[in-house]
A protein has these predicted regions:
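Glycine-centered hinge/linker elements that transmit conformational signals in sensory
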Residues: 29-34, 70-104
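Extracytoplasmic/periplasmic substrate-recognition and gating elements
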Residues: 134-206
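Short, solvent-exposed loop/beta-turn-alpha elements that line the ligand-binding surface or hinge
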Residues: 18-20, 66-85, 148-159
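Acidic, glycine-anchored loop motifs typical of Ca2+
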Residues: 38-46, 154
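Short helix-initiation/N-cap motifs at beta->coil->alpha
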Residues: 21-27, 101-115
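Alpha-to-beta junction loops
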Residues: 115-124, 139
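Periplasmic solute-binding protein
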Residues: 1-16, 51-72, 162-169, 234, ...
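C-terminal capping/gating helix-and-loop segments adjacent to ligand/active sites or protein-protein/ligand interfaces
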Residues: 197, 206, 212-251
Length: 251
Protein backbone atom coordinates (compact mmCIF):
# COMPACT_ATOMS: atom_id res chain seq x y z
CA UNK A 1 0.00 0.00 0.00
CA UNK A 2 0.95 3.68 -0.32
CA UNK A 3 2.10 4.65 3.16
CA UNK A 4 1.66 8.38 2.62
CA UNK A 5 -1.98 7.99 1.58
CA UNK A 6 -2.82 6.00 4.72
CA UNK A 7 -0.80 8.30 6.97
CA UNK A 8 -2.50 11.43 5.64
CA UNK A 9 -5.88 9.83 6.35
CA UNK A 10 -4.80 8.92 9.88
CA UNK A 11 -5.29 5.19 9.27
CA UNK A 12 -3.39 2.57 11.25
CA UNK A 13 -0.81 0.31 9.62
CA UNK A 14 -2.61 -2.83 8.34
CA UNK A 15 0.32 -4.91 9.57
CA UNK A 16 -0.45 -3.86 13.14
CA UNK A 17 -4.11 -4.73 12.59
CA UNK A 18 -3.14 -8.13 11.21
CA UNK A 19 -1.01 -8.85 14.28
CA UNK A 20 -4.07 -8.20 16.45
CA UNK A 21 -6.38 -10.27 14.25
CA UNK A 22 -8.27 -7.14 13.13
CA UNK A 23 -7.23 -6.97 9.46
CA UNK A 24 -10.41 -8.31 7.86
CA UNK A 25 -12.33 -7.74 4.66
CA UNK A 26 -14.68 -5.42 6.54
CA UNK A 27 -11.77 -3.34 7.82
CA UNK A 28 -10.17 -3.26 4.36
CA UNK A 29 -13.46 -2.11 2.85
CA UNK A 30 -13.66 0.60 5.51
CA UNK A 31 -10.17 1.77 4.53
CA UNK A 32 -10.89 1.72 0.79
CA UNK A 33 -14.10 3.69 1.21
CA UNK A 34 -12.29 6.32 3.28
CA UNK A 35 -9.45 6.60 0.75
CA UNK A 36 -11.55 6.91 -2.40
CA UNK A 37 -12.20 10.59 -2.99
CA UNK A 38 -12.04 13.68 -5.17
CA UNK A 39 -8.77 15.27 -4.04
CA UNK A 40 -8.95 18.51 -6.03
CA UNK A 41 -12.65 19.37 -5.80
CA UNK A 42 -13.41 19.15 -9.52
CA UNK A 43 -16.20 16.63 -9.01
CA UNK A 44 -14.21 13.71 -10.41
CA UNK A 45 -12.86 10.88 -8.26
CA UNK A 46 -9.08 10.81 -8.65
CA UNK A 47 -7.96 8.84 -5.58
CA UNK A 48 -8.93 5.19 -5.33
CA UNK A 49 -8.77 2.63 -2.58
CA UNK A 50 -7.65 -0.14 -4.93
CA UNK A 51 -6.46 -1.05 -8.40
CA UNK A 52 -4.68 -4.12 -9.76
CA UNK A 53 -5.16 -7.18 -11.96
CA UNK A 54 -8.47 -9.03 -11.57
CA UNK A 55 -6.83 -12.48 -11.65
CA UNK A 56 -4.56 -11.60 -8.73
CA UNK A 57 -7.59 -10.30 -6.87
CA UNK A 58 -9.56 -13.52 -7.39
CA UNK A 59 -6.64 -15.68 -6.29
CA UNK A 60 -5.95 -13.72 -3.14
CA UNK A 61 -9.53 -13.19 -2.04
CA UNK A 62 -10.35 -16.88 -2.34
CA UNK A 63 -7.22 -17.87 -0.43
CA UNK A 64 -7.89 -15.30 2.29
CA UNK A 65 -11.43 -16.65 2.61
CA UNK A 66 -10.16 -20.16 3.27
CA UNK A 67 -11.22 -21.57 -0.08
CA UNK A 68 -10.23 -22.31 -3.69
CA UNK A 69 -12.11 -22.59 -6.98
CA UNK A 70 -10.44 -25.64 -8.53
CA UNK A 71 -8.33 -27.40 -5.94
CA UNK A 72 -9.78 -30.89 -6.17
CA UNK A 73 -11.96 -33.04 -8.42
CA UNK A 74 -15.05 -31.22 -7.15
CA UNK A 75 -16.28 -27.94 -8.64
CA UNK A 76 -16.17 -25.17 -6.05
CA UNK A 77 -17.04 -22.05 -8.05
CA UNK A 78 -20.64 -22.14 -6.80
CA UNK A 79 -19.70 -22.64 -3.14
CA UNK A 80 -20.84 -20.04 -0.57
CA UNK A 81 -17.21 -19.17 0.20
CA UNK A 82 -16.31 -18.40 -3.42
CA UNK A 83 -19.59 -16.52 -3.86
CA UNK A 84 -18.55 -14.28 -0.96
CA UNK A 85 -15.36 -13.49 -2.87
CA UNK A 86 -17.19 -12.67 -6.09
CA UNK A 87 -19.72 -10.52 -4.23
CA UNK A 88 -16.89 -8.60 -2.59
CA UNK A 89 -15.28 -7.95 -5.98
CA UNK A 90 -18.60 -6.88 -7.50
CA UNK A 91 -19.19 -4.46 -4.66
CA UNK A 92 -15.69 -3.01 -4.90
CA UNK A 93 -16.24 -2.02 -8.52
CA UNK A 94 -19.98 -1.42 -8.75
CA UNK A 95 -21.40 -0.55 -5.32
CA UNK A 96 -18.70 1.14 -3.25
CA UNK A 97 -16.74 2.21 -6.36
CA UNK A 98 -13.52 2.00 -4.37
CA UNK A 99 -11.66 0.25 -7.20
CA UNK A 100 -10.46 2.27 -10.15
CA UNK A 101 -12.70 1.34 -13.12
CA UNK A 102 -11.31 -1.67 -14.96
CA UNK A 103 -9.43 -0.80 -18.16
CA UNK A 104 -10.18 -3.68 -20.52
CA UNK A 105 -8.16 -2.04 -23.32
CA UNK A 106 -4.87 -2.01 -21.42
CA UNK A 107 -4.46 -4.96 -19.05
CA UNK A 108 -1.11 -3.83 -17.61
CA UNK A 109 -2.39 -0.35 -16.81
CA UNK A 110 -4.56 -1.85 -14.08
CA UNK A 111 -1.52 -3.37 -12.39
CA UNK A 112 0.66 -0.28 -12.77
CA UNK A 113 -1.81 2.49 -11.90
CA UNK A 114 -0.32 2.73 -8.38
CA UNK A 115 2.82 4.29 -9.87
CA UNK A 116 0.93 7.58 -10.23
CA UNK A 117 0.57 7.80 -6.44
CA UNK A 118 -3.23 7.92 -6.37
CA UNK A 119 -3.95 4.27 -5.49
CA UNK A 120 -4.01 3.25 -1.82
CA UNK A 121 -3.87 -0.55 -2.18
CA UNK A 122 -2.66 -2.78 -4.99
CA UNK A 123 -1.31 -6.31 -5.39
CA UNK A 124 2.48 -6.32 -5.44
CA UNK A 125 5.17 -8.95 -5.87
CA UNK A 126 8.95 -8.99 -6.09
CA UNK A 127 8.92 -9.13 -9.90
CA UNK A 128 6.46 -6.23 -10.10
CA UNK A 129 8.53 -4.18 -7.65
CA UNK A 130 11.64 -4.89 -9.71
CA UNK A 131 10.05 -4.10 -13.08
CA UNK A 132 8.52 -0.85 -11.83
CA UNK A 133 11.47 0.20 -9.65
CA UNK A 134 9.31 0.64 -6.56
CA UNK A 135 12.41 1.65 -4.60
CA UNK A 136 12.67 4.80 -6.72
CA UNK A 137 9.10 6.03 -6.22
CA UNK A 138 8.43 9.29 -4.39
CA UNK A 139 6.22 7.51 -1.85
CA UNK A 140 6.82 4.58 0.48
CA UNK A 141 5.61 1.13 -0.57
CA UNK A 142 4.60 -1.06 2.38
CA UNK A 143 3.67 -4.72 2.06
CA UNK A 144 1.07 -6.32 4.29
CA UNK A 145 -0.74 -9.69 4.43
CA UNK A 146 -4.16 -10.09 2.88
CA UNK A 147 -7.11 -9.30 5.15
CA UNK A 148 -9.04 -12.32 6.37
CA UNK A 149 -12.43 -13.06 4.82
CA UNK A 150 -15.67 -13.92 6.66
CA UNK A 151 -15.26 -17.66 6.02
CA UNK A 152 -11.53 -17.70 6.71
CA UNK A 153 -9.27 -17.33 9.70
CA UNK A 154 -5.60 -16.76 10.42
CA UNK A 155 -4.79 -20.45 10.08
CA UNK A 156 -6.47 -20.81 6.66
CA UNK A 157 -5.28 -17.46 5.28
CA UNK A 158 -2.99 -18.33 2.36
CA UNK A 159 -1.01 -15.97 0.17
CA UNK A 160 0.68 -18.00 -2.55
CA UNK A 161 -0.80 -20.20 -5.26
CA UNK A 162 1.62 -23.12 -5.42
CA UNK A 163 0.15 -24.29 -8.73
CA UNK A 164 1.54 -21.23 -10.54
CA UNK A 165 4.34 -21.80 -13.03
CA UNK A 166 4.97 -24.41 -15.69
CA UNK A 167 4.24 -28.09 -15.21
CA UNK A 168 5.10 -30.81 -17.71
CA UNK A 169 3.10 -34.02 -17.81
CA UNK A 170 3.68 -37.38 -19.47
CA UNK A 171 0.31 -38.89 -20.45
CA UNK A 172 -0.47 -42.47 -19.49
CA UNK A 173 0.20 -44.90 -22.32
CA UNK A 174 3.14 -43.01 -23.86
CA UNK A 175 5.76 -45.32 -25.35
CA UNK A 176 9.02 -45.26 -23.40
CA UNK A 177 8.04 -42.68 -20.75
CA UNK A 178 11.52 -42.90 -19.21
CA UNK A 179 13.06 -41.59 -22.43
CA UNK A 180 10.54 -38.74 -22.54
CA UNK A 181 11.39 -37.88 -18.94
CA UNK A 182 15.12 -37.88 -19.66
CA UNK A 183 14.66 -35.57 -22.64
CA UNK A 184 12.73 -33.09 -20.51
CA UNK A 185 15.28 -33.40 -17.72
CA UNK A 186 18.20 -32.65 -20.03
CA UNK A 187 16.29 -29.77 -21.59
CA UNK A 188 15.75 -28.18 -18.16
CA UNK A 189 19.22 -29.02 -16.82
CA UNK A 190 20.89 -25.95 -18.33
CA UNK A 191 22.98 -25.61 -15.15
CA UNK A 192 24.43 -29.12 -15.61
CA UNK A 193 23.75 -30.09 -12.01
CA UNK A 194 25.51 -27.03 -10.56
CA UNK A 195 22.88 -25.77 -8.12
CA UNK A 196 25.05 -22.79 -7.17
CA UNK A 197 24.80 -21.65 -10.78
CA UNK A 198 21.07 -22.36 -10.86
CA UNK A 199 20.29 -20.57 -7.60
CA UNK A 200 23.00 -17.93 -7.58
CA UNK A 201 20.77 -15.05 -8.67
CA UNK A 202 17.85 -15.81 -6.38
CA UNK A 203 18.67 -12.98 -3.98
CA UNK A 204 17.46 -10.29 -6.38
CA UNK A 205 13.98 -10.42 -4.87
CA UNK A 206 15.37 -9.54 -1.44
CA UNK A 207 16.32 -6.10 -2.77
CA UNK A 208 12.85 -5.72 -4.29
CA UNK A 209 11.35 -5.77 -0.80
CA UNK A 210 13.03 -2.37 -0.19
CA UNK A 211 12.80 -2.62 3.62
CA UNK A 212 13.44 -5.33 6.20
CA UNK A 213 9.81 -5.07 7.28
CA UNK A 214 8.59 -5.76 3.74
CA UNK A 215 10.99 -8.68 3.43
CA UNK A 216 9.62 -10.19 6.64
CA UNK A 217 6.08 -9.91 5.27
CA UNK A 218 7.15 -11.50 1.98
CA UNK A 219 8.89 -14.35 3.80
CA UNK A 220 5.82 -14.98 5.96
CA UNK A 221 3.45 -14.95 3.01
CA UNK A 222 5.71 -17.14 0.90
CA UNK A 223 5.47 -19.94 3.44
CA UNK A 224 1.67 -20.16 3.25
CA UNK A 225 0.54 -21.67 -0.03
CA UNK A 226 -2.71 -22.99 -1.48
CA UNK A 227 -3.34 -25.07 -4.59
CA UNK A 228 -5.83 -23.74 -7.16
CA UNK A 229 -5.89 -24.50 -10.89
CA UNK A 230 -8.87 -22.37 -11.93
CA UNK A 231 -6.84 -20.00 -14.13
CA UNK A 232 -5.06 -22.84 -15.93
CA UNK A 233 -8.09 -24.82 -17.09
CA UNK A 234 -8.41 -23.12 -20.47
CA UNK A 235 -11.95 -21.93 -19.74
CA UNK A 236 -13.45 -18.63 -20.86
CA UNK A 237 -14.11 -16.71 -17.66
CA UNK A 238 -16.08 -13.50 -18.32
CA UNK A 239 -14.60 -11.55 -15.43
CA UNK A 240 -15.01 -8.19 -17.18
CA UNK A 241 -18.78 -8.57 -16.89
CA UNK A 242 -18.42 -8.89 -13.11
CA UNK A 243 -16.08 -5.90 -12.90
CA UNK A 244 -18.21 -3.56 -15.00
CA UNK A 245 -21.51 -4.56 -13.41
CA UNK A 246 -23.04 -6.48 -16.31
CA UNK A 247 -23.15 -9.65 -14.23
CA UNK A 248 -23.49 -10.35 -10.50
CA UNK A 249 -21.82 -13.15 -8.57
CA UNK A 250 -25.11 -15.07 -8.49
CA UNK A 251 -25.33 -14.94 -12.28
Amino acid sequence: YNKQILDEAGLEDPNALYERGEWTWDKWREYMVALTRDSDGDGVIDMYGYDSRWDFLVYNLTMSNGTVIAGSDKENLSSPEVTECLDFIYNMYNVDHVAKPWNSDDFDSNQNAYLDGNIAFWIDAAWISSANNDAGLDFDVVWCPWPIGPSGNEATNKFKNVSSGNAWMIPAGVDNPELVYNVFYDWQNWYHGDTDLRDGDLTWWEDCAITEENYAVMEYMGQRGAFDLWNALGLEWDWSALLNGEMTAAQ
